[in-house]
Curated annotation (Swiss-Prot):
Phylogenetic lineage: Eukaryota, Viridiplantae, Streptophyta, Embryophyta, Tracheophyta
Any Gene Ontology biological process: response to bacterium
Topology with respect to the bilayer: Multi-pass membrane protein
Protein name (record): Reticulon-like protein B11
Location within or outside the cell: Endoplasmic reticulum membrane
Pfam families linked to this entry: Reticulon
UniProt keywords, alphabetically: Endoplasmic reticulum, Membrane, Transmembrane, Transmembrane helix
C-alpha cells in the first residue's frame, strides 16, 4: 500500500527535466547524443587542460580554417560553374536578442533582490546562505580551474539524473530525513525579531 502511494506521488525525472530532447540526453535515452556530448567534452577538456592548448588560438585557428575553406570553395565554384557553398545567414534575430535580454534582466533583478534582502532587510539567514555559497565557490576555485569545473559539471549532469531516476525513492527518503534534521537544528537558533514602528 505504501509503495503504491509513493509511486503515485512520485515525480517523473523526465518530466522535471522538461520532457524534451535535453531530458532525453541527460537520461541517456538519446544514447548517440549523450555519447557525443561525453566524448566531445572529454576531448575539449583534454585538449585545453592536459595538452596545454590555448582556447583563443584554437578558436582563431578553427575560424581561419573555415574562412579559407569557404573562400577556396567559392573561388573554385565560380571557375568550375558550380553552386556557391551553402553559408547560413549569420545574423542574430531580434526576437532572440529580446528574449535573451529579458532572461538576463530577470536574473539580474533576482540577484539585486537578494542583495537588497541582505543589506536593507538585514536578513541574517540569507547573508549566511550567500556567504557560504560564495566561500564554497572561492574554495573550489582555488582547487581546480574553471574548465575542469565545467567538465565535472558535464559529467555530473550526465550521471546524476540517471542515478536519481533509478534510486529516486531511496534518495528522496535520505533527503527528507536530512532536511528534517537541519530544520530541527535551525529551530534551536533564535532569530532576531524586526520591531518596526508603524506610522499612520
Amino acid at each position: 500500500m505504501g509503495d503504491s502511494v509513493s509511486s503515485s506521488s512520485r515525480v517523473s525525472v523526465h518530466q522535471s527535466l522538461g520532457a524534451g530532447s535535453v531530458a532525453d540526453l541527460l537520461l541517456w535515452r538519446n544514447r548517440t547524443g549523450a555519447v557525443i556530448l561525453l566524448i566531445s567534452s572529454t576531448g575539449f577538456w583534454f585538449l585545453f587542460e592536459r595538452a596545454g592548448y590555448n582556447l583563443l588560438s584554437f578558436v582563431s585557428n578553427v575560424l581561419l580554417l573555415l574562412v579559407a575553406i569557404f573562400f577556396l570553395w567559392a573561388k573554385s565554384a565560380t571557375v568550375l560553374n558550380r553552386p556557391l557553398p551553402p553559408v547560413p545567414n549569420m545574423e542574430i534575430p531580434e526576437e532572440f536578442a529580446n528574449k535573451a535580454a529579458d532572461d538576463l534582466r530577470v536574473w539580474i533583478n533576482y540577484v539585486l533582490s537578494i542583495a537588497s534582502d541582505i543589506t536593507i532587510a538585514r536578513n541574517p539567514i540569507r547573508l549566511l546562505q550567500v556567504s557560504l555559497v560564495l566561500w564554497a565557490i572561492s574554495y573550489v576555485g582555488t582547487l581546480i580551474n574553471s574548465l575542469t569545473l565545467v567538465y565535472i559539471g558535464v559529467l555530473l549532469s550526465l550521471s546524476f539524473p540517471i542515478v536519481y531516476e533509478k534510486y529516486q525513492d531511496h534518495i528522496d527518503e535520505k533527503v527528507n530525513s536530512t532536511s528534517k534534521f537541519v530544520r530541527n537544528i535551525s529551530r534551536k537558533f533564535p532569530l532576531p525579531i524586526n520591531k518596526e514602528k508603524k506610522h499612520q
